[in-house]
Amino acid sequence: MKKALIIGAGPAGLTAAYELLTKAMDIEVVVFEESDCFGGISKTVNYKGNRMDMGGHRFFSKIPEVNEWWDNMLPMQGAPTYDDIVLKREMPVHKGGPDPEKEDRVMLTRHRVSRILFDTKFYDYPISLKPETFKNFGVLTTLKVGFSYLGSMFHKLPEDNLENFYINCFGRKLYSMFFEYYTENLWGRHPSEIDASWGAQRTKGLSIMGILKDFFGKLFKVKNRKVNTSLIEEFKYPKLGPGQLWDVTAAEVEKLGGTIIKNAKVTKLHKNADNVLTSLTYEKDGQEFTMEGDYFISSMPVKDLVGGMNDVPAEPARIAKGLPYRDYMTLGVLVPKINLVNKTNIKTINNIVPDCWVYVQDRNVKLGRFQIYNNWSPYMIKDLEHTVWIGLEYFVNEGDEYWNMTEEEFAKIGVSEMVKLGLIDSPDVVLDVHMEKVKKAYPAYFDTYDEMDRLIEYLSGIENLYCVGRNGQHRYNNIDHSMVTSFEAVKNIISGTKDKKNIWSVNTEQEYHETSNNEDEKNQAEVD
């Protein structure tokens, strides 16, 4: 029996394992996971009964195969959630689906509310054409935004960097208000230094024109209109956070006979004289082990993959070594309440603001976003009625001053910024805090990234290596696109296809903007 060795037990790795075990019965599957949990950046951390979502993950896809896969692992709710019952909110339920009040293995339908906090005022994320928006802007700023956008329509800049891409989409004024500082805070680089392709993937074709179409489509109730995924108003979400999906998947993989080795860091991959991988070496419990395999599916960072491989030519080695990443830190803060006033028409427990997360556009703080876990799922919080569980999100570099902080030091900064933003009155109201860190959370689009095609060519030449997922391809994929790279890899393994173009082309800009015969099948998703 042939053996597939899969590096990483995140969305891409576990999807590949499950697909192989259900579609290729003659292949043994072994998964190596560096940490002690599943899901990668999509994991859920349980701290004293309060759960944290690393980065916030909405599940929304227009790829039928992905939706069917999710439904198989976590069936859609067949009865209301706790907060919908208490608040008498109407949300769709699926006949015959599990009751989230009685069962855990269930996917919920949740409201999408994300806003920008700018100059102490709330704005929709993405910006929408509502009276409140213009009221917040004031007459002068509204005029500046309008004329700035008109100027960008008639004078297009070359889209050779992210700054020009955003200015072409939104005009210089909106760019300076809502994109410039946030992007620099996120990546640690000014947008003028970042490749434009990141914007194309993450804004999903969104622009002022797209916002106008959405506005008038709602106004006149246009049927069958195409909805840009950055504008979706509902999404799926696992009852116990995104990590639950991957915990369930891991259990299914093991049930099907797959092996998962946790706390196993893959450090080396060994090629023979024919440029074919023969084995890998991993560290576990302070010891080194080597395992032979026939197929190697990697979701580990490309930089580490190539760095651990023997006999790599100088050029691909240099490109891989220069690939940049941004790391992530979050501080869970438990408080009795937050000061933000709910002025929306969406009911919530204790009338807290309904946002899943809020983008912070304030040059006086380091904080990039904060999540309100109560609104993702009522089952994420131990005491929903009496506490609010906030996740403060910071974008950092491994080894910098933030990354090296103790939890106490990090909490002091995070809580002080909550006070500065008016979220709480004093540090004294904080009931508890918890810090989490994620290495290489975001593959970045600068430095040697513009030479990525040459690295892809080299990796594709290793016939039994399949690179999948966000870090496996150094591409800012959403969960569904990461899964599709694994679908494609498994198809190639089963069919014996040597060409890897189908795997690497998932969520490329060209394919991303293609339109199928059925608009609802366009390959887009919103999972952040």
Predicted segments, located by residue:
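Conserved mid-domain beta->alpha element of the FAD-binding
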Residues: K156, D294, S298-L305, E401-F410, ...
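Active-site/ligand-binding neighborhood in enzyme catalytic cores
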Residues: P131-T133, F137-G138, T142-H270, T278, ...
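Conserved Rossmann-like nucleotide-cofactor binding loop
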Residues: A12, C37, K303
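C-terminal lid/capping helical subdomain adjacent to the catalytic/cofactor pocket in oxidative enzymes
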Residues: M435-K439, Y445-D528
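N-terminal Rossmann-like FAD-binding beta1-loop-alpha1 element of flavoenzymes
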Residues: K2-V31
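Dinucleotide-binding Rossmann-like beta1-alpha1 core, especially the glycine-rich loop
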Residues: K48-S152, K204
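Mid-domain catalytic core of redox enzymes
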Residues: K23, P238, K262-N404, E408-E409, ...
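Glycine-rich FAD pyrophosphate-binding loop
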Residues: L21-Y47
